[in-house]
Design a protein with these regions (language model features):
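Secretory/organelle targeting and membrane-embedding segments
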Residues: 2-177, 181-523
Length: 523
């Protein structure tokens, strides 16, 4: 199958939901060819787990419901638990968002599902799985997609057994691997070597769901599809770049898992570094998967390993005046080891040592139990030279808000309306909910799973890209693991440690605190 376009064409007249998906189906290899192509079997490894229940099955249902999958697609769940399809359906129902009018379609979806129980390290279990797949329509000719919704501790056994017992005989086989892709550079390289000994790179889909988000995918179009940004997207005009990921909740019972990884491994080394590479990379020769990923690797190679002096680490503590979970600090979570020094907040400053970005700080900020839910890219531009307005002008900023409420807006100066002759801050605003009211933005997993069906790897992580990401962070992570520095406490629901604000101010980010956003829908 060919590569699909990453976005549906938008006409001047808003499209209905059915029209949107009709347009998308046309882009999937001219609709008919894609939908009536070979039989596909999608196998969910770890079908009894939370990821499968909350994300994978719902995503497959939405794609099936909207007619975006090939017509002859079947689904097989595999896990150690003794389950039935009815049991899986019952556990998934709260997350499927199925309406009463979709009941018949939902029944058809689950009629395409089957389930096999087995052990991940047991060859006989996978031989049995293969026998079951061969009984489905398409038999040995069906294409197979394996989604590893599993802990990384079983990747080795599962992938080896897939290779030896479950590869499609006459169709293609693709394997989707969830993060974490290792714990540091060495473990990541070992995993990559293991996978490459079993599969070719075009069979491996390392999924970072952030690469499926609307505004992350929009970064390339915004940069390379608009003439106005090219001349200013460099060190001559950009003072600094801030990449932010904030969550308003803590670990809430997931402390055991989180404590093994921490916020840097969980968010910064993958999600935020992916954003950085899309902001900083050079223009690719085309939008082909390898051309795009080649440029991302090139820019990552220009970043030196992070040093501790460019990092602030924090850990949230309870707010005595808060409500519910806000009263509890990280160490109050019963699943967290006593006295843990794991970071729930981090700010780091990176520099891209190339002609375009030399000297421009890239500030990565992420944390849990903060004052809001927000993920965004913010380019702050340099001051206007030769100021004639008596220091009343603030720096321009271009902001790409990834979540919530996708938007692109530019902070700029304009004359204050009325008899005044002085500048004030305002914005050029493209809020998606206002501009594209009738467009259903697909979930990140919908986009990415559809990409796997189509064979597009643009929004998946390649092995050399992964290697460079770990090279940048591993020395810092090893130092933190060895020295266990005490993280700076910050109150649940706050902005994070004040020391982080001091760091970003020191490297050149300017926070004026004077800007007031006005919702255009409430004027």
């Amino acid at each position: 199958m060919g590569t699909r376009a990453s976005a549906v064409k938008m006409s001047a007249i808003p499209l209905s939901r059915s029209e949107v998906f009709g347009e998308l189906r046309k882009e999937l290899h001219n609709d008919h060819e894609f939908r009536h192509s070979d039989v596909h079997v999608f196998i969910i490894m770890g079908a009894s787990g939370d990821l499968a229940k909350k994300k994978i099955y719902p995503t497959l249902w939405w794609l099936f419901r909207d007619g975006l999958l090939p017509e002859k697609t079947f689904f097989v769940g595999f896990a150690r638990s003794d389950l039935t399809v009815d049991a899986i359906r019952a556990s998934c129902m709260p997350y499927l968002k199925a309406t009463d009018s979709e009941a018949d379609r939902l029944s058809v979806f689950f009629s395409r599902n089957s389930y096999i129980s087995g052990k991940y390290a047991d060859e006989d279990s996978f031989a049995n799985l293969n026998k079951h797949i061969l009984t489905l329509p398409g038999g040995s000719e069906a294409n197979r997609l394996f989604y590893l919704a599993l802990p990384p501790t079983v990747y080795h056994d599962v992938t080896k057994n897939i290779k030896h017992h479950c590869m499609s005989e006459k169709g293609w086989t693709r394997v989707i691997v969830e993060k974490p892709f290792g714990h540091d550079l060495q473990s990541s390289e070992e995993l990559s070597a293991h996978l490459s000994s079993l599969f070719t790179e075009d069979q491996i889909y390392r999924i970072d769901h952030y690469l499926g988000k609307e505004m992350v995918q929009n970064l390339m179009v915004l940069r390379f599809g608009n003439r106005i940004f090219g001349p200013i997207w460099n060190r001559d005009s950009v003072a600094c770049v801030v990449l932010t990921f904030k969550e308003p909740f803590g670990t809430q019972g997931r402390g055991g898992y989180f404590d093994d990884f921490g916020i840097i491994r969980d968010v910064m080394q993958n999600h935020l570094l992916q954003l950085l590479s899309l902001v900083a990379m050079e223009k690719p020769a085309s939008t082909s998967s390898d051309d795009v990923r080649d440029e991302k690797v090139k820019v990552l190679k220009c970043i030196n390993p992070i040093v501790m002096s460019d990092v602030v680490l924090g850990q949230y503590v309870g707010d005595p005046e808060g409500e519910g979970d806000a009263k509890l600090g990280y160490r109050d979570d019963p699943t967290v080891p006593v006295g843990s020094t794991q970071s729930t907040f981090a700010t780091a400053v990176l520099y891209v040592h190339n002609e375009r970005w030399d000297g421009v700080p890239f500030i990565l900020r992420c944390g849990k139990a903060l004052n809001e839910r927000k993920a965004e890219v913010r380019l702050q531009f340099t001051d206007v030279p030769g100021d004639i307005f008596g220091n009343q002008c603030r720096r321009n900023e271009l902001v790409v808000r990834v979540q919530p409420n996708e938007a692109v807006y530019a902070k700029m100066m304009s004359k204050k309306p009325g008899v005044y002759f002085r500048p004030e801050e305002t914005e050029l605003d493209l809020t998606y909910k206002s501009r594209y009211k009738d467009v259903k933005l697909p979930d990140a997993y919908e986009r990415l799973i559809l990409d796997v069906f189509c064979g597009s790897q643009m929004h998946f992580v390649r092995s050399d890209e992964l290697k460079e990401a770990w090279r940048i962070f591993t020395p810092l992570l090893h130092q933190i693991d060895k020295e266990k520095p005490e993280p700076i406490p910050y109150k649940y629901g706050s902005r994070g440690p004040a020391e982080a604000d001091d760091l970003v101010k020191r490297v050149g980010f300017r926070y004026e605190g004077t800007y007031v956003w006005v919702n255009p829908n409430k004027l």
